[in-house]
């Protein structure tokens, strides 16, 4: 909701009851994952405050339990640590922090690029490169060369997208809507989630399967849905920071089409519902085949989409009057 004086406006939200109704499957390893994440943050102190650690560990452990509910306990922890690392890096070095000191973000990005290129172990005094080095070594041991390289490439894309986002976050009106729609799947981490899911769930598409139009269309629909849902859920929190409007779908739709914020939310919500219908159709089509890597991929994408729908109800994404942590991804 938004406030104008004493008036309260409820912003319209998309309805997913026909496409991704809850309750969603949940891993039995959520509590163990939460404990492991807290211990991992002791080894790699990525966040400065106990509150920030608590909020991020909570949403990450509960979120991954819905993202990959069939993963085994150790693989779920590995996936959770990767997602926590990405989110913590964005919270600490991306978005508004980066807009104030873009040079520092570029320097941090250079450090991570060296790690992704297979450089020497970074010192533990620099927790983000050190933690990334640890994660990459464990993923490399877990999978084959092709899957590992896809994961590393997706991480590079995500990190570079965060630099792009930081460059534009203070003046979102300068960003073309089409460019934003192409970049958003990278800044919301969903392409990295796709790559990690194949490793964690122990399946791998062939190049021919990956090139199939139904697979590409389904991946695009889920990737779009993830970013757009997140934009609607986090808009109020980001707008409360001011003075610029958030670099997000409602802002750019309003710039393109005019009208009120409520109209922009309604338009974005319609886009979400349409993309959810495309995703559901693709999942139903692929998952109905005999068990194979394609059916495993369809089920994985279904759970990933469900997890983004679930995330919107977490305190991290609630408005400022409801006590959310000052983060937005």
Curated annotation (Swiss-Prot):
Superkingdom assignment: Bacteria
Question: What is the UniProt remark on how the cofactor binds and its stoichiometry?
Answer: Binds 3 Mg(2+) ions per subunit.
Which GO molecular-function terms appear in the entry?
Answer: metal ion binding; terpene synthase activity
What EC number(s) has UniProt assigned to this enzyme? 4.2.3.193
Cofactor(s) the record lists: Mg(2+)
Instruction: Describe the reaction catalysed, as an equation.
Output: (+)-copalyl diphosphate = (12E)-labda-8(17),12,14-triene + diphosphate
Chain span(s) of sequence motif DDXXXE motif: 90-95
UniProt-annotated binding residues for substrate: 184, 237, 316-317
The protein's UniProt keywords, in alphabetical order, are: Lyase, Magnesium, Metal-binding
Q: Where does Mg(2+) 1 bind?
A: 90, 95
Motif: NXXXSXXXE motif; annotated at 230-238
Residues at which Mg(2+) 3 binds? 230, 234, 238
Pfam families, A to Z: Terpene_syn_C_2
The record lists Mg(2+) 2 as bound by: 95
According to the UniProt entry, the note on domains is: The Asp-Asp-Xaa-Xaa-Xaa-Glu (DDXXXE) and Asn-Xaa-Xaa-Xaa-Ser-Xaa-Xaa-Xaa-Glu (NSE) motifs are important for the catalytic activity, presumably through binding to Mg(2+).
Q: Which family does it belong to?
A: Belongs to the terpene synthase family.
Explain the purpose of this protein: Involved in the biosynthesis of the mercapturic acid derivative diterpene cyslabdan A, a potentiator of the beta-lactam antibiotic imipenem. Catalyzes the conversion of (+)-copalyl diphosphate to yield labda-8(17),12(E),14-triene (biformene).
Q: What is this protein called?
A: (12E)-labda-8(17),12,14-triene synthase
Gene name linked to the record: cldD
């Amino acid at each position: 909701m938004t406030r104008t004086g004493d008036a309260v406006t409820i912003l319209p939200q998309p309805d997913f009851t026909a496409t991704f109704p809850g309750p969603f499957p949940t891993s039995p390893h959520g509590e163990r994952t939460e404990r492991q994440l807290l211990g991992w943050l002791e080894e790699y102190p990525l966040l400065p405050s106990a509150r920030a650690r608590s909020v991020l560990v909570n949403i990450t452990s509960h979120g991954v339990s819905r993202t990959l509910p069939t993963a085994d306990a150790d693989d779920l922890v590995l996936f959770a640590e990767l997602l926590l690392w990405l989110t913590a890096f964005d919270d600490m070095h991306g978005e508004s922090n980066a807009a104030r000191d873009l040079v520092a973000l570029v320097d941090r990005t250079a450090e991570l690029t060296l790690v992704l290129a297979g450089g020497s172990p970074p010192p533990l005094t620099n927790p983000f490169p050190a933690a990334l080095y640890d994660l990459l070594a464990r993923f490399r041991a877990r999978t084959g060369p092709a899957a590992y390289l896809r994961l590393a490439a997706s991480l590079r894309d995500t990190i570079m997208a965060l630099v792009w986002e930081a460059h534009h976050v203070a003046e979102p009106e300068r960003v073309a809507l089409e460019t934003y729609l192409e970049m958003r799947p990278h800044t919301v981490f969903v392409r990295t989630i796709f790559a990690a899911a194949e490793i964690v769930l122990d399946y791998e598409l062939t190049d021919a399967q990956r090139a199939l139009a139904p697979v590409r269309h389904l991946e695009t629909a889920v990737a779009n849905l993830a970013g757009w849902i997140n934009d609607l859920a986090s808009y109020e929190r980001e707008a409360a920071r001011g003075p610029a409007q958030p670099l997000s779908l409602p802002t750019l739709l309003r710039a393109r089409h005019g009208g009120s914020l409520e109209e922009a939310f309604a338009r974005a919500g319609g886009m979400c519902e349409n993309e959810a219908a495309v995703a559901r159709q693709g999942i139903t089509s692929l998952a109905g085949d005999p068990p194979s890597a394609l059916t495993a991929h369809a089920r994985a994408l279904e759970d990933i989409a469900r997890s983004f729908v679930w995330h919107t109800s977490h305190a991290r994404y609630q408005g400022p009057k409801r006590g959310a942590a000052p983060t937005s991804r």
